[in-house]
Amino acid sequence: MAGAKAAVRSLFDDLASEYVAQRGREFSFVSQKRLVLEMLAGVRGRILEIGCGAGHTLPDLLDMGLEVDAIDLSEQMVARASEHVRRHRPGGRCRVAAGDIERLDFATAQFDAVLLMGVLEYLPGQAQAIAEIVRVLKPGGCAVLAVPNGAGAYHIVRTLYRKLRGARDQALVGKPCLPWRLDGDFAAAGMRKTESAACNFIFFPLKDLAPRLSDRINRLLTPTARLPTAPLLGAQYIAKFRKI
């Protein structure tokens, strides 16, 4: 486990500069961020963002009037996120630090909300991470998350294609999550799902063969993110859970 975390930390240390330059402008991230912020509407008090990356969501959380704590496994991402907040929301109530989702350095029942995007898929197992999320949430608090959707068309077709070709993914590629399994894991930990959506409507191999057409289709389908059919097509699963 320690070796896997060190590898993930090293990967995102190396990606930090790229995240600063590109991540905030990518449509896949922008559409994902819009959905999670909609799910956080109405939250008051204190929020923890786990896996904050280069900090692209932090100004939005501050604009919502929230007191923000943010952590990332990567020290380089922490440095970029801290600078992003200083530049865009100087004086905002935001603390950024290195941290591990499986050992959160916060007391029990501290937060009104927890946000994590692109985190759970890098863990070999998710039980300890979910337990920590539940622990630091206040009763009635909510968790909003985004993960690759293992039930979506893109990941199903891509996985089947690679199996037929005998190809192997790189060790650090985030593993897509099955929505119903994730929902069940959170329910078992004392969290009730209150809403969900899907985004990033990309299709394999179109995304690689015709990226411009793929982007147009993605943008065309994005308004369907909350329809019941969205999890069948969206490559990203977004969900909100409330602590019972």
Give residue ranges: language-model regions.
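A conserved beta-strand element that flanks and buttresses the S-adenosyl-L-methionine
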Residues: 115
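Acceptor-substrate binding/catalytic loop of class I
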Residues: 164-181
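A C-terminal cap/extension of S-adenosyl-L-methionine-dependent methyltransferases
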Residues: 158-162, 184, 195-244
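Conserved class I S-adenosyl-L-methionine
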Residues: 1-42, 44-53, 56, 60, 80, 144-166, ...
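A short glycine-rich, Lys/Arg-flanked "PGG" loop and its adjoining helix->strand segment in the class I
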Residues: 127-139
